[in-house]
UniProtKB/Swiss-Prot annotation:
Primary localization: membrane
Record carries keyword Transferase: yes
Modified-residue entries (Phosphohistidine), positions: 474
Keyword flag tRNA processing: no
Gene3D superfamilies with a match to the protein in the record: 1.10.287.130, Histidine kinase-like ATPase, C-terminal domain (3.30.565.10)
Pfam families: DAHL, HATPase_c, HisKA
Transmembrane intervals: 19-39, 260-280
PROSITE patterns per UniProt: HIS_KIN, RESPONSE_REGULATORY
Gene this protein is translated from: virA
Protein name: Wide host range VirA protein
Localization in the cell: Cell membrane
EC number(s) from the headed UniProt entry: 2.7.13.3
Bilayer topology annotation: Multi-pass membrane protein
Length: 829
């Protein structure tokens, strides 16, 4: 069993070895370190930018100091020299930093650095030339101013000349804006002063000496100052700074991209490692799950050990499956492959669940159409099964082919919503269901073998009893016939009021009872002659309904319900009559107060074989005769013995124990089967399955020859039947019974016929001919005569003597004997 139904052991490939996972962890750490580590030399870059900013500042300061020295406001040239030194030092530091950085080799910074060096060299040369010439110029201006101020004249005092003159005015103008014209005029004025008499010669000589110097140096100094002021050192430094920032930004972008890539790679490796570890964990859990499944199979096998019933064993197994899959409910249903009818239902809890037939048929159809032979669905629990307790949430529904004829449908119910299970869990559920179905099939076969063994033992016991009874029955019948014959002779020769007549009646009554017992014994021995003919069970039951009513106490009500389908079987109606009488009498004896006996005739189809207490019923079509009562029921301990000969629970009250034994014999003679279900305190139900016949049924009157139909004396019987052929058949039957038939097609025709003064002793009306506003219960009032209603297949009658005056309802078909008794009864009343 385990070798066949245990899961197939597979090689679970984990996809990674432990050493490979360790290598991936190391790689992830390396990538993470590279992602967070610093790539560029930020300090060098910041130092380069700082040096460039210093060059900008020193260049601006140098231009300021040169401007102050040119205007004469600053006579100290040390700041200028220190600025030049600072610029030189910054340039050397910048070259050193550039050699340490990769920026020079990867950008235009090297060319800009060379331009910056050239610009600084030019500025340095210009400053040095400016320093030498500006000192000489300032000295000449000072001497020129002093000499000019010592001359008398109209010169006005200024910051430069204390006694301005015309010469002073022109010199000031020349200082502000040197030009050749002004220089020429100043030269003419100096010559004039030299030629002018009466002036101090010393100042004039100074003016003549220093004036030309000023006129020649001032334009040169102006040019040097302009050269220094327009130096592109600061501009080149700014360009170099922008270039460095741009290169630095590009490097940052590349570095950021690389960091993102390395970080992503590290994170990806970490996620992959987590996935590998998760898969290893899942596979480990799955292996543990498979081991638990092995234990599940063993536990299911243990449930079917011993002598427990199949239902209780299956229920225990379903509880194990429910616990294994952590479900709240678990149910299994076996469905016929072709008919799509449920054969058996098992549940982990009591009572058994009631399945939704539409969902069941749908999933069975899908299972038949699916080549994989397995259908899995998850839908609402309320759409699958009506559980004894309201289980909200979802149900897992799995169907697969259990055998060639059966489909197993397993349902797991959950109170809370759950995700779809993995394919492995579905496979385990399918295998567990297959294992359970296998055990159920084995137990069923074992039960069938046990039933067949008991049936063989019962048949051997019946054969022994029949052999013994058959040997003495005929001799005993001869003796009993002689006794009854002489008793009847004595009865006819004695007056009715005699005490002896009463004793003789007792003898005859006891003899009749003894004959019944002999008939039952002959039935057990199968030595009684049988007359086999096809007949309708519905017609027979309708025929013997008055006889059944007479055999029962007045406190028992009989209820009949017939199927519209044909219910023809082959056999002896006398035997079926005896079956009905015996079962109904037993039912009435189990009732202490007013009781109800229901007799139902229908068609039944059995999709698979059914195990009964006294045999196995094969699948197929049957005529089902059900007799149920609401009596006290049969105890469970007594139920297996009710068909045994001479077994009786009423031995003290005259029970022989042959009634149900003869019933079993009669049903076996019909090649039928009988199934009994009973609940103590609620009643008993006998289901008699009889094989149907396709032959035309004969009239039951041919079996009841001694019970001749009563005849009439020419009374008029009016008949309303819309079917022409059926109306003619009824008229022939009525005429054969000694009555005068008058047929009508519609109810209005007979009403018009009576309104014209015609009279009828009895009216028979087909229910189909009644108008919609005409109630069947008021036909006799409308037609002012007794009426019999014909039609329908349901017969609900209480044939007590107090009800003979009420309307009589006859179901179709109507036998001649039934019609004769009904007409005679209504005419007499």
């Amino acid at each position: 069993m385990n070798g066949r139904y245990s899961p197939t052991r597979q090689d679970f490939k984990t996809g990674a070895k432990p050493w490979s996972i360790l290598a991936l962890i190391v790689a992830a750490m390396i990538f993470a370190f590279m992602a967070v580590a610093s790539w560029q030399d930020n300090a060098t870059t910041q130092a380069i930018l700082s040096q460039l900013r210093s060059i900008n500042a020193d260049s601006a300061s140098l231009q300021r100091d040169v401007a102050r020295a040119h205007t004469g406001t600053g006579r100290n040239y040390r700041p200028i020299i220190s600025r030049l030194g600072a610029l030189r030092k910054n340039l050397e530091d910048l070259k050193q930093l550039f050699r340490q950085s990769h920026i020079v080799s990867e950008s235009n910074a090297a060319q800009l650095l060379r331009q910056l060096e050239v610009s600084l060299n030019s500025a340095d040369a210009a400053v040095r030339a400016f320093g030498a010439q500006n000192v000489r110029l300032q000295d000449s201006l000072a001497s020129f101013t002093r000499a000019l101020s010592s001359l008398p004249g109209k010169a006005s005092t200024d910051q430069t000349l204390e006694k301005p003159t015309e010469l002073a005015s022109m010199m000031l103008q020349f200082l502000r804006q040197p030009s050749p014209a002004i220089s020429f005029e100043i030269s003419l004025e100096l010559e004039r002063l030299q030629k002018q008499r009466g002036l101090d010669e010393a100042p004039v000589r100074i003016l003549a000496r220093e004036g030309p110097i000023i006129l020649s140096l001032l334009p040169q100094v102006k040019d040097l100052v302009n050269m220094i002021q327009t130096s592109d050192t600061a501009e080149i430094a700014e360009m170099l700074q922008r270039e460095c920032l741009e290169v630095y930004s590009l490097k940052n972008v590349e570095e950021r991209s690389a960091r993102i890539f390395l970080g992503s790679a590290s994170v990806g490796l970490c996620l992959y490692i987590i996935t590998l570890v998760y898969r290893l964990r899942k596979k480990t859990d799955w292996l543990a799950r498979r081991l638990d499944y092995e234990e599940l199979i063993k536990e299911i096998g243990v449930c079917f050990e011993g002598e427990a019933a199949t239902t209780s064993s299956a229920q225990a197994a379903l509880r194990i499956i429910q616990r294994f899959f952590d479900a709240d409910t678990c149910a299994l249903r076996l469905v016929d492959h072709d008919r799509r009818w449920a054969v058996e239902t098992f549940g982990a809890k009591h009572p058994k669940p009631v399945w939704d037939d539409s969902v069941l048929r749908e999933i069975v159809s899908r299972t038949k159409a699916d080549e994989r032979a397995t259908v899995f669905r998850i839908i609402s629990s309320k759409k699958i099964v009506h559980l004894p307790l309201e289980i909200p949430g979802l149900s897992i529904l799995l169907a697969h082919k259990s055998t060639d004829k059966l489909i197993a449908v397993c349902s797991l119910g959950y109170q809370s919503y759950r995700p779809r299970p993995c394919q492995g869990e579905i496979q385990l559920l399918e295998l567990a269901t297959a294992c359970l179905c296998h055990y159920i099939d084995v137990r069923r076969k074992q039960t069938e073998c046990d039933v067949l063994a008991r049936r063989l033992e019962h048949a051997q016991r019946l054969e022994a009893v029949g052999t013994l009874a058959g040997g003495i029955a005929h001799e005993f019948n001869n003796i009993l016939g002689s006794i009854l014959g002489h008793a009847e002779l004595a009865q006819n020769s004695v007056s009715r009021t005699s005490v002896t007549r009463r004793y003789i009646d007792y003898i005859i009554s006891s003899g009749d009872r003894a004959m019944l017992i002999i008939d039952q014994i002959l039935t057990l021995s199968r030595k009684q002659e049988r007359m086999i003919k096809p007949f309708s069970v519905s017609e027979l039951v309708t025929e013997i309904a008055p006889l059944l009513r007479m055999a029962l106490p007045p406190n028992i009500e009989l209820s009949f319900r017939f199927d519209q389908m044909q219910s023809v079987i082959e056999g002896s109606p006398l035997e079926l009559q005896q079956v009905l009488i015996n079962i109904c009498k037993n039912a009435s004896q189990a009732m202490t107060a007013n009781g109800q006996i229901d007799i139902i005739i229908s068609q039944a189809f059995l999709p698979v074989k059914k195990i009964l207490a006294h045999g196995v019923m094969p699948p197929g079509d049957y005529v089902l005769l059900s007799i149920s009562d609401n009596g006290g029921g049969i105890p469970e301990a007594v139920l297996p013995h009710i068909f045994e000969p001479f077994f009786s629970t009423r031995a003290r009250n005259g029970g022989t124990g042959l009634g149900l034994a003869s019933v079993h014999g009669h049903i076996s003679a019909f090649a039928g089967y009988i199934d009994v279900s009973s609940t103590v305190g609620h009643g008993t139900r006998f289901d008699i399955y009889l094989p149907p016949s396709s032959k035309e049924p004969v009239n039951p009157d041919s079996f009841f020859g001694r019970n001749k139909a009563p005849r009439g004396n020419g009374e008029i019987v009016a008949l309303v039947e819309p079917d022409d052929l059926l109306r003619e058949a009824y008229e022939d039957k009525i005429a054969a019974l000694g009555y005068e038939p008058v047929g009508f097609r519609t109810f209005n025709e007979i009403r018009d016929w009576i309104s014209k003064g015609n009279e009828a002793d009895l009216v028979m009306v087909d229910q189909a001919s009644l108008p919609e506003d005409q109630s069947p219960n008021s036909v006799d009032l409308v037609l002012k005569t007794s009426a019999i209603i014909i039609g329908g297949n349901d017969l609900k009658m209480t044939l007590s003597r107090e009800d003979v005056t009420r309307d009589l309802y006859l179901p179709k078909p109507i036998s001649s004997r039934t019609m004769a008794h009904a007409i005679l009864t209504k005419i007499k009343t």
